[in-house]
A protein has these predicted regions:
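Residues lining hydrophobic/aromatic ligand-binding pockets adjacent to catalytic sites
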Residues: 1-233
Length: 233
C-alpha cells in the first residue's frame, strides 16, 4: 500500500519556527513542505478557483511523486448541491487536470444538512466518470448505509472517513481500490495513530490518502511526521 500523507494546506505563516525555518519566504514553502510530505489537501479551492498559472507553478515546485488533492467548489457541493453544476464542475476539473500525474483525488465535502440522496450522487458521479477520482465526505448520518456504499463502489469512488472531537469517525469501508482519511483531532497518541495505520492497511487499498488538520501550533506537521514514522516500523 502506498501512503500519501500530508496536511490541509501548506502556506501557513504560523508554522514558521516550528515546522518551517523562521526566515523561509512564503514562495519557498511548498517546495520545503514537499520534501517532508507526499501530498497536500488544498482547501482554498472550496471558495476560489486558482488560475492556470498558479497551478502550473505548483507542479514545478514538487517531485513527480507528489499529489495535490483539491477540495471541490462550494458552488458545486453547498450552493447547488450537485445539481445543474456542469459548467462549474467542468471548469474545476479543467483546472485540476493541469496537475497531470500530480493530480490526486477531488474531495467533495457535503454540508451537514444535506440528507441522503443516492440518485443525485449517482448522476453526478456518472457525469465526471473518468475525469477525476472522487472522494465523498458525508456529514449527515442518513448517508451511512449500504445503498450509499454500493453507489460509491459502482463508481469506484471513495467514502471519505473524517475523525474529529465533535464527530468521531465511522468505520473504514472499502468502496474503491484507494481510500481517503481525514484525521481532524488536535492530538493523537502513538497508540491512536498505530490503530489508524492498522485499520487502513487492513482495507488492502492500493493507495491511502491521509490528511491531518491545520493548527496554528503546527500540530498537523508533527502528527503527519509521526504517522509516517510509525507506518515505516
Amino acid at each position: 500500500m502506498k501512503f500519501f500523507v500530508g496536511i490541509s494546506g501548506y502556506a501557513h505563516k504560523e508554522w514558521k519556527g516550528s515546522f518551517y525555518p523562521e526566515k523561509l519566504p512564503q514562495r519557498e514553502m511548498l517546495a520545503y513542505y514537499a520534501k517532508h510530505f507526499s501530498a497536500v489537501e488544498i482547501n482554498y479551492t472550496f471558495r476560489q478557483l486558482p488560475s492556470q498559472s498558479v497551478v502550473e507553478s505548483w507542479t514545478q515546485q514538487v517531485p513527480a511523486s507528489f499529489r495535490f488533492v483539491l477540495k471541490a467548489s462550494q458552488v458545486v457541493t453547498h450552493f447547488k448541491r450537485l445539481q445543474n453544476v456542469k459548467k462549474e464542475t467542468d471548469d474545476f476539473l479543467r483546472i485540476a487536470a493541469i496537475l497531470k500525474k500530480r493530480q490526486g483525488p477531488v474531495l467533495f465535502q457535503l454540508p451537514p444538512n444535506f440528507k441522503k440522496d443516492v440518485s443525485r450522487v449517482a448522476a453526478f458521479l456518472t457525469s465526471i466518470q473518468g475525469r477525476a477520482k472522487a472522494a465523498f465526505e458525508f456529514r449527515h448520518p442518513s448517508w451511512f448505509d449500504d445503498e450509499v456504499v454500493d453507489c460509491l463502489r459502482r463508481h469506484k469512488s471513495a467514502l471519505c472517513v473524517a475523525d474529529s472531537e465533535d464527530l468521531p469517525a465511522t468505520d473504514l469501508v472499502r468502496t474503491a481500490n484507494w481510500g481517503y482519511v481525514r484525521l481532524r483531532r488536535e492530538r493523537y497518541t502513538d497508540k491512536a495513530l498505530r490503530k489508524w495505520i492498522s485499520a487502513i492497511r487492513s482495507r488492502r487499498w492500493d493507495e491511502a490518502y491521509v490528511f491531518f488538520k491545520h493548527e496554528d501550533s503546527a500540530a498537523g506537521p508533527k502528527l503527519a511526521t509521526r504517522f509516517l514514522e510509525l507506518a515505516r516500523l
